[in-house]
Amino acid sequence: MADRYGQQPQSYRGNSGFGNLGRRNDDYDPYGDGYPSDRYGTSTNPASRPSTASRNAPPPRSAQRGRTGAGDMQIQSNAERQIGNVLDLIKREWPAMVETDCIPVQLALQLLDTSSVGRAHEYRNFQQTHQFLQESLKNIVHDHHQGFNSSIGTFHKIQGSIQSSQKKVRALKESLAASKTALCTTNPELKQLHATSRMYDGVLQTLNELDDLRTVPDQLEARISEKRFLTAVEVLQNALRKLRKPELDNIGALSDLRSYLANQETALMDILVEELHEHLYLKSPYCQERWQNLAKVQGISHETYGDAPGVAPFHGILDTIDWEKSVAEDPQKNPEADTFYYVTLLVEALNRLGRLETAVDMLKQRLPVELFAVVNETINDVDQKHPSSLRGGASGSHGLNIYGHRETRMRADVIHDLLSTLYGKFEAIAEGHRVLHEAIKALIRREGAGNNSVLLGGFKELWNLYQNEIRALLHNYVTTDADVYQFSRTPRPGMGMNGRADSARDNLFKFSEVDAKSAEMASEYEALDSIIRAAVPGLTDSTRRDNKKGSLIIPRSEPITSRKSAGYGSGSSQQNSGTYKSLVEPSVFNMSLLLPPTLIFLQRLKSIVPPGSDLATSTLTSFLDNFLVNVFQPQLDETLGKLSDTVFGEADAFQQDSDWAQVAKRPVYKGTTAFFTVITAFCRMLGTIPHDQALSTLIITQMVRYYDRCFSWYKALVTKTQEGGDKQIREKEKLRASAILATEPSEVRETIQRLWKSENLNDLELLYREVNQLIAWANGRDLDASDIIQDRDMIQSMCLLYTSMKWLSVKIHGLRHITRNETDSSKSSFPTKAEKKRWTLLNDPSKATGGEAPVYLPMTEETVENFDSILVSYDELASTALLTLHLEIRTRILHSLQTALSPLTTAPYLLDQEVNEPDPEILSLNSEMVAYDEILVRCLRLREVQFVRNGLGKLINGFLIKNAPMTAPMNAKGCGRMQLNILVLQQNLKNIEEGVDLVRASNYFEMFERGVDAILEKAREGVASSGSQETGDAGRKSEDAGEEGAETPNSRKSAEIFGDDKDRFSYDELKALVELCYSEQLADPERGVAAAAKRQMADKLLNLSEYMWQS
């Protein structure tokens, strides 16, 4: 063994008979780690590392059993240590031998070279090393000879197996060659058998197909009943393909099956289309929850436009659908439970059936009919939910009613329920059509069919019908006349060739005008029903007869009769020829209830419109512009005009409102509150629609009309009654005296206006100036009874005119609101882009309820000027009415005093006996002043009452003193009559004007009773001493100033000095009193008496003048 392995030491270097267990590379490495291919390495400390033999040789079993841990060293044998030492020695002594490029011949030559450069002297060491290496190898062999022996035996067995396999493969190749040669040999019998076998296979396949076709009807019906339509289409098409095979053409028994399957193909398409209609138009019970939740969202107008928590967002549903993959059926779930999934499944089934385009055409054709059915059903459902007796029927007002809060709330509930339900259904239908659109679009994209506009154009048709239905709703519930505006230019039904209505088509009667509860109608209906039941039994249901007696008749309690659905535009007029029942009476005020839900619906519809479609979302509200300008605005103008005419024309429009305390602090006209109610209602309604100056202008126009009406009423109050006479009387002279002073520019009017505008209504300077001007004005004309307002109701109406105008001015001023939106449809024939955008400004649907929201009238800077001017007109009319009231009591006093002082109209003041009763004119004046004051207190505020009251005593005092000469001639008993009249007036005035008395006038006439000497004594005592020279000037010029009615410094000084002093009189006043003292003598028929009296009077007047000038 040692010789065998020793002959080739290098072939087994480092293997030890066990292979290359210690190598890290696949190529043989004879040296180790120290060199690129060195097997042993070049460690400088051989004792610190195991030997190469120990690393390459497998550990002995004893060493494997002796492992005590992961860090224990392998126990080496003596042979392994010996070979390691040899290797270390070679590396140390003969390093060239371990190099990869070692040349043994070169080393051998060096060992044989005995020269100084040779290594012959190391030859013995080389031999010893070689001998040491041989012994080490032998020891290794001896230690591992059993492993070597077993390896040799195993090698021979493997070699034998390989040789045996080679022999078998060679024999197999020879057999295959022989088989190939045998198969190439021709055999007619085998060929005949093969043909017969193929024929039998065909017959068996045909029989199997016939057996499969026999079960197709049952399978098809089962799949259709389970609504697994994809499987049903697949079964049907597979069966039809089988029947189209040529080998089955001659089988006559299949003709019935062919006919059946052909019919089933059409029937299946009809079923699929019907199923689509069931889910697109919400007929399926599985669709109810979706549209009901959407209806709730439509009803929440004061919240966001987003989806409610109970409704899955539609865009989220679209995102969850994988349009890139064709839909697949799930037998484990009900396909109808998910409407959108079911629609895509039906579209896929129709496409696989090859009838998708036909189905889309059928959907488009039936779309108007289906929508009409949805709207009609919704109206009927809402009609049953809300009793007609609670929502108000047709009252013959033609939409001119302004309902109270309760009626408005009930009508709003009806419209709210109708629109929320209808728009909820419309939105659900639109979502279904969007899913249908997306399913067809994805189908076309997957099949690469391009952009098929025929299949994808249905959404625009849906929108056109939606637009018509919305327009019809707005038209039915806003306009009171069906012919106010025609949305279609086509002739209306019943119109002749000349455009006139065909009289033959006129309705002779209307069911809405029939009283369904009358006994005559009930008996007629019973007779008709019995005839029908006798002629066609079963046609009418006897169990429902009692409950449906009036089903053929629309009761009178129902609102306005059914109105035609607006089948306007795009070919829908013929299909949409049915009628809708109006649930509430049409009125422009319904616009505030109709428009916000409509805008919410349109806002939500924008998110449903498929992107890239031929329907631009920005144009969804364009039809509302047309409706607003061409329908709503004329209807608003007409309704507003009619309502105003109703307010103006009411018999009690200018009567006191019985419920004035609920709206004002003082009584106002009933017509004024009604007019403001109209204005408020319209402003509230305008607040719910986009701003349009044309609409605001309509309201301002009615305000102007109301001013004109009130001003006409004022003129009617102050115009004299014509009792014949000259008809050519001037317009100015038709008015009563107080109205002339209150309306025409004059100093009296200016003074009174200054007094009213001053903070102190007791300004003595203005009061005495007014008194002097009024006396001067009255002395320049003769007042008669026609100059005075005799009717107390007219006085009260004048007070109400003032309070009404002031109240209306304040209330309307609260409506003032300036907006930056200057849209004015009246200035343009066609809607501009700005006008189309105005609907987007209404993003706050909280205005729909509007009950608690502030009401205002939006106006531009231009429009507000007209608004402010009408408010000024209201204030001016109120001021005119107040001035008229102020002057009326004064003209009445002046007229009564003129009558009482004039001896020509009443008894003379030359009396033979004392008078114990005041003059009837004075008593009449007292009663009129008391009644006048009562009316003022009842109707006006305290400031206005004081404005009218203040100065009455001063006016009576002044007039009695200034016009004392009117009573001439007068004696002592006549003066007593005057004193009695003054006393009666004073007692009465104390109940009207606070702190008033007529002592000055009483003192004045008391000096008459004492005589001329007493007058002079008064003057001598300096009664008028403070008047000085100015008083004398005033005395000489007062007549001219009084007659001209002009205010001079002297007259003002006289007013200041003598106006408020009970015992001081001016020169003119004392002079007139002296003349009055001699009036009886001057009137004596004897000339001597009169001449003597005149001389005495001249002397007394001279003395009076001297006293006055000396003072």
Swiss-Prot record:
Name the keywords, alphabetized: Exocytosis, Protein transport, Transport
What domain of life does the UniProt record list for this protein's source? Eukaryota
Q: Which InterPro entries match?
A: Sec8/EXOC4, Sec8_exocyst_N, Sec8_M
**This protein's record includes keyword Transport:** yes
Region Disordered: list its residue ranges: 1-79, 1023-1057
Q: Where is the composition biased (Polar residues)?
A: 42-55
What cellular component terms from Gene Ontology apply here?
A: exocyst
Q: Which Pfam families match?
A: Sec8_C, Sec8_N
GO biological process terms held by the UniProt record: exocytosis; Golgi to plasma membrane transport; protein transport; vesicle docking involved in exocytosis; vesicle tethering involved in exocytosis
Keyword Transport present in the record's keywords: the answer is: yes
- The Low complexity compositionally biased stretches are 31-41
Family of the protein in this entry? Belongs to the SEC8 family.
Q: What does this protein do?
A: Component of the exocyst complex involved in the docking of exocytic vesicles with fusion sites on the plasma membrane.
How is this protein organized at the quaternary level?
A: The exocyst complex is composed of sec3, sec5, sec6, sec8, sec10, sec15, exo70 and exo84.
Q: What is this protein called?
A: Probable exocyst complex component sec8
Instruction: State the species of origin.
Output: Neurospora crassa (strain ATCC 24698 / 74-OR23-1A / CBS 708.71 / DSM 1257 / FGSC 987)
Source lineage: Eukaryota, Fungi, Dikarya, Ascomycota, Pezizomycotina
